[in-house]
């Protein structure tokens, strides 16, 4: 965030995907009671680890971390908790978290990530994601899935005003 001509740019997305994401993030922050900063914000979405050649329509799950980073850069929430895990979620215009597609795949990919420097030795990595997806992600051992319902709840967790319990994994049924 820089203090010159106001602009909110999402670099690396198609025009439509960037416009939709910007609108969801702006609206969710407004619903939270925060004014959108009158500054220059550039978010670069780099696709080097994505197998698809066109990620422009598949990154709505970055709405939550982008919104939280904007709040942290404004000093509205502390930065430290944001680095304690991975935050994923598509925001609705009202600030609610929408279900993710591929939560289990995302959780599995996080297990192989190098967490040194983020987690203390021996701690299990944290994955913050929509509450409806947390039991699915909790199927992966080696990660703690924590379910969120909204941007407001994510802010409360980041500010340590509320605690979350790890999700219980979905029950496996034998047929």
Residue map of PLM features:
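Peripheral, non-AAA+ core regions of ATP-driven protein-machinery
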Residues: 1-175
